[in-house]
Amino acid sequence: MLRIALPNKGRLSEDTRGLFNDAGLEVRSSGERALTASLGGEFEAIFVRAQDIPEFVADGAADAGVTGWDLVSESGRELTSHLDLGFGRCRLVVAAREDAGVRSLEDLARQAPPMRVATVFPNITRRFFEMAGVPVTVVPVSGAAEIAPHLGIADVVVDLTSTGSTLRVNGLREVETVLRSSAHLITAVAGPRNGDVSRKQEFDDLVTALASVIRARGQRYLMANVPREVLDAVRAVLPGLNGPTVIDIADHSRYVAVHAVVSADTIYRTISQLRALGGEGILVTRIERLIP
């Protein structure tokens, strides 16, 4: 049985549990404070801090894990991402005070060295500025890096942001994006896919289950009755995965039923186009899982 390390609290934990539940891998634990749980009876889950998951996976305490890519990068461990889970999206950015006159890394390089940079991500920050050729002194903090320039303990910050609103509220301006992050399913480089056949199959089944839910979230299943003579035009409107499925309707020679998978982003336009072609009885449903 594979052991999967999952975040033990916060939004990342909630979104992870939601994804696993939707994939049929219900998290079954003995209580809210339980350290382990069963995942649909197929896998064992252990609950740890998101920032510790890269270490647990790299050291073999867990076969796989779910955590933010920012934390994986900060750990410096050799880990492989098998799936971007599509939530927990954010950016790690360099930000300076609005009144500092800093608009680019070139502006930072012209400042009297060394610049002081406050961050929760000292390893990523050092690597970034070394590659940029900008000398800095990294000031590690455990949180609230955005107030460091106002307290005089740093000139700029490297901090996470989703919308940039927290930075703006604190009078900071984004200068450069260091890293884009989201939640990933990770393993060690020599992970389950390099193990025995049964463990490889277990892990492949896990990836397939999670990916099927992620893929389905942006799609809808559309069904409609359309005049037979406009099928060519309907095929142009409903490309689907491999084109629409066309089904004869009993006792109705003029109309056929078409079924197709359609992007949720374009569903309203698709419905309008079908109606213009004489489509009727249009039904749209959500898709729980999609395996191409």
UniProtKB/Swiss-Prot annotation:
Pathway listed for it is: Amino-acid biosynthesis; L-histidine biosynthesis; L-histidine from 5-phospho-alpha-D-ribose 1-diphosphate: step 1/9
Intrachain disulfide bonds = none
Q: Does the keyword Cell cycle apply?
A: no
Location in the cell: Cytoplasm
Looking up InterPro entries in the UniProt record yields: ATP-PRT_HisG_long, ATP_PRibTrfase_cat, ATP_PRibTrfase_CS, ATP_PRibTrfase_HisG, HisG_C, N-reg_PII-like_a/b, N-reg_PII/ATP_PRibTrfase_C
Alphabetical keyword list: Amino-acid biosynthesis, ATP-binding, Cytoplasm, Glycosyltransferase, Histidine biosynthesis, Magnesium, Metal-binding, Nucleotide-binding, Transferase
GO biological processes: L-histidine biosynthetic process
Gene3D superfamilies attached here? 3.30.70.120, Periplasmic binding protein-like II
Which chemical reaction does it catalyze? 1-(5-phospho-beta-D-ribosyl)-ATP + diphosphate = 5-phospho-alpha-D-ribose 1-diphosphate + ATP
- Molecular function terms in GO for this entry? ATP binding; ATP phosphoribosyltransferase activity; magnesium ion binding
State any GO CC term.
cytoplasm
Does the record's keyword annotation contain Heme?
Answer: no
Q: How is its activity regulated?
A: Feedback inhibited by histidine.
Identify which cofactors the protein needs according to its UniProt entry.
Mg(2+)
Q: Which domain of life is it from?
A: Bacteria
E.C. number(s) listed in UniProt: 2.4.2.17
Q: What are the transmembrane regions?
A: none
Relate the protein's function as given in its record: Catalyzes the condensation of ATP and 5-phosphoribose 1-diphosphate to form N'-(5'-phosphoribosyl)-ATP (PR-ATP). Has a crucial role in the pathway because the rate of histidine biosynthesis seems to be controlled primarily by regulation of HisG enzymatic activity.
Q: Which family does it belong to?
A: Belongs to the ATP phosphoribosyltransferase family. Long subfamily.
Protein name per the record: ATP phosphoribosyltransferase
Q: What is the species listed in this Swiss-Prot or TrEMBL entry?
A: Gemmatimonas aurantiaca (strain DSM 14586 / JCM 11422 / NBRC 100505 / T-27)
Gene from which the chain derives: hisG
